[in-house]
């Protein structure tokens, strides 16, 4: 019997950015349909608008009002259509409440489809946080990003962000907050929670005996308290508690040398304490900037939300407003995110 292909809901992201373009480019790869059944969620007019820009005017868009209507045929992009964009007010590369709300609503719809069991996984294109909150804050709402939206709409309290580039994986104790606040969030219970989430993610990816590394917060991992005490008071106790639960974990380790070992295959996942501690090493190996084209190329990283009752993966880059509408955006991160979603969905 042929293996069942998962249905993956792909949100369009902020339509003023690169999401619609890279979605078309990704789904132009016919082999994607060998692995998944892709369903785009958003305003179909935005996908139609970029077919030529993306270099694929031969492709077509099928608007559907239910998952059951989708046929998942290469060359035709199934879009769960939501009437979100006024074409007279739309402009590429501009922050707007209209596009921010469109991106937000497409994410919420994808979550609803996954929670209802109508799709097997979700995969998100980038949204612009300023645009989204420009739309939401007048209503008394605010979200820092995708992860917080997913946590709210799935009722999840224990979650974390994982970034992956091939065999390098990092999972964060904190992400979108000021660095001063990030230091305050380094607490034993949270560090232990993230160690466990990272270990579980590796198991779901088929790694039988995950090796987990934990970075220190301070220079030289605190140098035995000389440069800070968080390693002694919070991080080390969390590591000991994780070991007591049978997790193979090492640390706290100095982050300036840790990633060389991780890239060499010594560890399966690295727990980092704050946003840039994990994003910098992963994006250093996952991003390439083409100076001549003045554009990012070969963007291979993937963002995964851990701890949710549904699968959510994402591109590991922003909306690319400076490239929007020019046909120069790279779809590789989205292709990898779709594949990651399929891998995680197959384990559920």
Residue ranges and their predicted role:
Residues 91, 148-149, 164:
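Intrinsically disordered, low-complexity segments enriched in polar/charged residues with Gly/Pro
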Residues 90-91, 176-179:
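Gly-rich Lys/Arg/Thr-decorated short loops/hinges at beta-loop-alpha junctions or inter-strand turns
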């Amino acid at each position: 019997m042929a293996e069942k292909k998962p249905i993956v809901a792909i949100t369009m992201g902020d339509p003023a950015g690169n999401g619609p373009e890279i979605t078309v480019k990704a789904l132009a790869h016919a082999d994607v349909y060998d692995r998944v059944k892709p369903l785009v969620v958003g305003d179909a007019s935005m996908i139609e608008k970029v077919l030529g820009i993306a270099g694929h005017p031969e492709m077509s868009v099928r608007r559907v009002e239910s998952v059951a209507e989708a046929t998942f045929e290469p060359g035709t992009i199934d879009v769960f259509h939501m009437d979100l964009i006024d074409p007279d007010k739309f402009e590429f590369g501009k922050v707007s409440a209209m596009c921010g709300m469109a991106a937000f609503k497409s994410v919420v719809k994808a979550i609803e489809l996954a929670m209802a069991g109508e799709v097997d996984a979700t995969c998100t294109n980038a949204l612009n946080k300023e645009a989204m909150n420009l739309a939401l804050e007048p209503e008394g709402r605010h979200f820092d990003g995708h992860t917080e939206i997913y946590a709210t709409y799935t009722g999840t309290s224990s979650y974390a962000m994982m970034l992956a580039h091939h065999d390098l994986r990092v999972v964060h104790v904190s992400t979108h907050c000021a660095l001063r606040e990030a230091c305050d969030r380094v607490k034993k219970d949270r560090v232990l929670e993230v160690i466990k989430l990272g270990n579980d993610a590796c198991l779901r990816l088929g790694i039988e005996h995950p090796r987990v590394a934990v970075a220190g917060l301070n220079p030289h991992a605190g140098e035995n308290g000389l440069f800070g005490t968080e390693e002694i008071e919070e991080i080390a106790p969390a590591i000991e508690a994780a070991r007591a639960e049978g997790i193979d974990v090492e640390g706290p380790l100095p982050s300036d040398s840790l990633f060389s070992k991780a890239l060499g295959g010594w560890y399966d996942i690295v727990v980092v304490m704050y946003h840039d501690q994990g994003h910098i090493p992963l994006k250093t190996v996952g991003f390439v900037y083409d100076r001549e084209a003045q554009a990012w190329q070969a963007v291979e990283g993937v963002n995964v939300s851990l701890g949710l009752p549904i699968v959510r993966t994402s591109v590991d880059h922003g909306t690319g407003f400076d490239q929007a509408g020019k046909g120069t955006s790279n779809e590789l991160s989205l292709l990898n995110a779709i594949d990651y979603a399929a891998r995680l969905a197959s384990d559920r």
